[in-house]
Curated annotation (Swiss-Prot):
It comes from the Bacteria. Keywords: Amino-acid biosynthesis, Arginine biosynthesis, Cytoplasm, Lyase. GO terms for molecular function: argininosuccinate lyase activity. Coiled coil: none annotated. Pathway: Amino-acid biosynthesis; L-arginine biosynthesis; L-arginine from L-ornithine and carbamoyl phosphate: step 3/3. It catalyses: 2-(N(omega)-L-arginino)succinate = fumarate + L-arginine. It holds the Pfam family ASL_C2. This is Argininosuccinate lyase. Its main location: cytoplasm. It is found in: Cytoplasm. Belongs to the lyase 1 family. Argininosuccinate lyase subfamily. Its EC number is 4.3.2.1. One of its GO terms (biological process) is L-arginine biosynthetic process.
Length: 460
């Protein structure tokens, strides 16, 4: 029998039960649903809506149900629609008529809203911890490779030499922002909707502040219509999750490229690579490719929820039942990708000699030659033109800038003196970057030390 069946003269069709039910996926919320119900039962007694004895009986019954679920003793019923009705039915079956008082001053509309918020705030903190571990890994690798020279790219064309440590600290900044965004999102997740009823509030003198304290919320939703219809916090989380996945995908794309024979910058560990069913020689970066692929899946979840919400009038609509699958999927994929990426990158071997060798081609010291002229008094645009002609000469004669003699330099400008031959050495080009945040080993080490302070003082 449906707990809402009094108004109906016949049972719903079996096909309707199957189509309407969400228990297949919202059972994931069982412990949050029970936590919300325990707090609600305590509040009902606190507000003298039910007796303390009744509240205690309900709380004990709910705790027993929680233990049974976690012991695998409960089989949820599809005909009961969702996790809320399943647990309430189990409670009534367990403690009798008193169990029917639990839903006083509550609707499934505010009940599911609090369940999702309880679930999501816990998951946000878990994702923050995974990002923290990744930031530690990035910092460790950056410190180890503070002076490992490699090509830096724009347009995927060799541009200027950088250090591998600098590259990792760039990603440190990206994921640091992700961590900050998650904590900011948490503020809007950690607001309590329970007590809003179906949409208009209740006629009972409930204490929503008591509920918020019981459940660890920072504040209550201030408008009952908004409380039950708001899914902004899910959309905001999914957007933040999409940015996290974008950052993972960007790094995975680089690793996939670096892992090719054409680049040869890295070798992925056998434990984090796969083979081919037909080509015996293959060693594929499948995990990086999967993370890149799952990024599109998370993006799709974001579009899913925004499209679902775009034309919904106030307040609750059944469409909103569909918010959970994309939310759960996003959470699971972000956590899984962060965890596997961290282990994969820790086990990766960086081929320092190949990276440095790649900086010998592509005229990656050309900007340094132009800067040299500027420091000697040549206007930058004039210096740019001089060095451009020098590069063209090198291309036409199959030379690098390092191959040029002092006489050849002076053919392009009399400003050049013998010290240019030291300036153009790639190690000196990297070391000469003295601006804050630049790629020199000295600056990268400063970044690493600042990162360690941030991890220790802010994230611990």
């Amino acid at each position: 029998m449906k707990l809402w069946g009094g108004r109906f003269s016949k049972n719903t069709a079996a096909l309707v039960d199957q189509f309407n039910a969400s228990i297949e996926f919202d059972q994931k919320l069982y412990k949050y649903d029970i936590a919300g119900s325990v707090a609600h039962a305590k509040m009902l007694a606190h507000a003298n809506i039910i007796t303390k004895q009744e509240s205690q009986l309900i709380v004990e019954g709910l705790q027993s149900i929680l233990a049974d679920i976690e012991a695998g003793k409960v089989e949820f019923q599809l005909e009961l629609e969702d996790i809320h009705m399943n647990i309430e039915t189990l409670l009534i079956d367990s403690i009798g008529e008193v169990g029917k008082k639990l839903h006083t001053a509550r609707s499934r509309n505010d009940q599911v809203a609090v369940d999702i918020r309880l679930y999501l705030r816990e998951e946000i903190l878990e994702i923050c911890e995974l990002i923290k571990q990744l930031l530690i890994t990035f910092t460790d690798i950056a410190e180890k490779h503070v002076d490992t020279i490699m090509p830096g790219y724009t347009h995927l064309q060799r541009a200027q030499a950088v250090t591998l440590g600098h590259h990792f600290m760039a990603y440190f900044q990206m994921f640091k922002r992700d961590h900050e965004r998650l904590l900011d999102c948490y503020k809007r997740v950690n607001v309590m909707p329970l007590g809003a009823g179906a949409l208009a509030g209740t006629t009972y003198a409930t204490d929503r502040v008591f509920l918020a304290k019981e459940l660890g919320f920072d504040a209550i939703c201030e408008n009952s219509l908004d409380a039950v219809s708001d899914r902004d916090f899910i959309i905001e989380f999914n957007n933040t999750a999409s940015i996290i996945m974008m950052h993972l995908s960007r790094f995975c794309e680089e690793l996939i490229i670096w892992n090719t024979a054409e680049f040869g910058f890295i070798e992925m560990d056998d434990a984090y690579s796969t083979g081919s069913s037909i080509m015996p020689q293959k060693k594929n970066p499948d995990l990086a490719e999967l993370i890149r692929g799952k990024t599109g899946r998370v993006y799709g979840n974001q579009v899913n929820i925004m499209t679902m919400m775009k034309a919904l009038p106030l307040a609750y609509n059944k469409d909103m039942q569909e918010d959970k699958i994309p939310l759960f999927d996003t959470v699971d994929n972000v956590k899984g990708c962060l965890e596997i990426f961290n282990e994969m990158i820790k086990s990766t071997t960086f081929k320092k000699e190949n990276m440095k060798k790649a900086t010998k081609e592509g005229f990656m010291n050309a900007t340094d030659v132009a800067d040299y002229l500027v420091k000697k008094g040549v206007p930058f645009r004039s210096a740019h033109e001089i060095v451009g002609k020098m590069v063209l000469h090198c291309v036409q004669t199959s030379k690098t800038i390092e191959d040029l003699t002092l006489d050849e330099f002076q053919n392009f400008s009399p400003t050049f003196t013998e010290d240019i031959l030291e300036v153009i050495q790639i190690e000196n080009c990297v070391a000469s970057k003295i601006s804050q945040g630049s790629t020199s080993p000295t600056n990268v080490l400063i970044m690493v030390n600042q990162a360690r302070v941030f991890i220790e003082e802010v994230l611990s």
